[in-house]
Amino acid sequence: MKGQETRGFQSEVKQLLHLMIHSLYSNKEIFLRELISNASDAADKLRFRALSNPDLYEGDSELRVRVSFDKDKRTLTIADNGVGMNRDEVIDHLGTIAKSGTKSFLESMGSDQAKDSQLIGQFGVGFYSAFIVADKVTVRTRAAGDKPENGVFWESAGEGEYTVADITKNDRGTEITLHLREGEDEFLDDWRVRSIISKYSDHIALPVEIEKREEKDGETVISWEKINKAQALWTRNKSEIKDDEYNEFYKHIAHDFTDPLTWSHNRVEGKQEYTSLLYIPSQAPWDLWNRDHKHGLKLYVQRVFIMDDAEQFMPNYLRFVRGLIDSNDLPLNVSREILQDSTVTRNLRSALTKRVLQMLEKLAKDDAEKYQTFWKQFGLVLKEGPAEDHANQEAIAKLLRFASTHTDSSAQTVSLEDYVSRMKEGQEKIYYITADSYAAAKNSPHLELLRKKGIEVLLLSDRIDEWMMNYLTEFDGKAFQSVAKADESIEKLADEVDENAKEAEKALEPFVERVKTLLGDRVKEVRLTHRLTDTPAIVTTDADEMSTQMAKLFAAAGQSVPEVKYIFELNPDHVLVKRTADTEDEAQFKEWVELLLDQALFAERGTLEDPNQFIRRMNQLLVS
């Protein structure tokens, strides 16, 4: 062989091979599904390229994949006449993993084999799965349109290096030969191989054929028998398709090893004609938050594959949705640029977005447990929706889930409809608080009066929550109100103040003025409040002022943060406030006021500019 060289696998491939062989062995038959799935993709790509260059078919447009085995040599071969690969493509596809962040992710994986096997599936391991059952894999391939002498040979035992060389290959496409390990003889059994193909590959449009050998007149006659239905699943009638087939098709297009949570298969006729098959995965991909993460739907036009990851059909906050769309209204030569500016695309995107939101609403209604699985995996992504998609804001809001004071649990299980159904008589607003953690939200002094009145408060502690609530202004005609902001509706909830209390408050007016004079412009205002029961003081912000959590978001993003001017609210019934008001010594008075302000700021922000000064002051006052 000419041009032979031995090369080392990229380190991530070595790690993946090791993990895969050990984690996926209990489900080893999936290697055949993966290799046939790759062959199907190769056929799709050839069909697409041949639209503009029919010569790529080289006189053979009947695309298929053929499976054969040799019991004497203990080999199993999967051969397709798809698009094939040149030498550079072989090295790129079979020697490296092109996903950024792969190395650190693989290093973080532990010894939980069940979990590992699910996560490994997300790499679209395809080809490498051959090493689960083979101790050596040989590949012979030639790219469509290349000369026969530009064929490529690739071989590896999957241990750290591979050999690549130039060969002559008359027919285009890829032929993968697995040299089976000892003990894997089941994959040399005709019936066993047929049953695996039927189980996993009925849904793909590419014919899968198995070799038949018959003795006729003393000679061995070879023929090929089609095993699968070879009809694209989404073109079939829904009533004819079993759940298992939908599940297997999902695994084929998503390169996932787990079943989806739910799906929606629809054929639309009329102004626009298209078929969509949309899936909600049961597990988030490991790189969901990676900027390079590819997402979007497979796009077909009149059943011809056009592209993977067509992100123009789904808003970013639904980037976890997998599936395909087959349109009759787009041109076969459509490009990503054309899709970007197409009215057809915009209309399809709008319809598919509504379809997904309806699918999620149905899942939430029919199976709360499954919806909780969805929420744990993708809730943070869905929370981007209110800012991104004003037109569907109400539908998105129905799908949101929160922790709340009603459940006494950090689990985000409360819907806005649940909250509204429990609102007290006369309650006009939906109350919420944002904080760095569930514990900080739950124990915030801002909740004291509302707890006393039995009014539910939503406890928001994800980083995105404050940003989301800037866009989510109302639900079911009821405004959202942060309990950390000054608001008349909260003060109104306080019990009617009796005449004696009013007199006592009037007597405290000089104290309030004294505090204002001391603090100056460090606070926006000083006032007495009846929204506290156990806490001496809190700080709040005006409705139009930037909140504490929003300021933290700005700071985390490296942006300049305007100074937040707080309202300092004092509880006139608290013993510490009364003691401070009775303190005549100015130095001692200053220490008490500073302590109360620091306590309030610490409860609100979780940090202080000078924590050592706070500790010193507190210790000093404790012993005074």
Swiss-Prot record:
UniProt entry keywords in alphabetical sequence: ATP-binding, Chaperone, Cytoplasm, Nucleotide-binding, Stress response
Chief place where the protein resides: cytoplasm
Pfam families, per database record: HATPase_c_3 (PF13589), HSP90 (PF00183)
Region of interest called B, as start-end residue ranges on this chain: 337-552
Xref: NCBIfam families: PRK05218.1
Molecular functions (GO terms): ATP binding; ATP hydrolysis activity; ATP-dependent protein folding chaperone; unfolded protein binding
Region called A, residue ranges: 1-336
PROSITE patterns: HSP90
Similarity field: Belongs to the heat shock protein 90 family.
Gene this protein is translated from: htpG
Protein name, as recorded: Chaperone protein HtpG
Entry GO terms, CC: cytoplasm
The organism of origin for this protein: Salmonella paratyphi A (strain ATCC 9150 / SARB42)
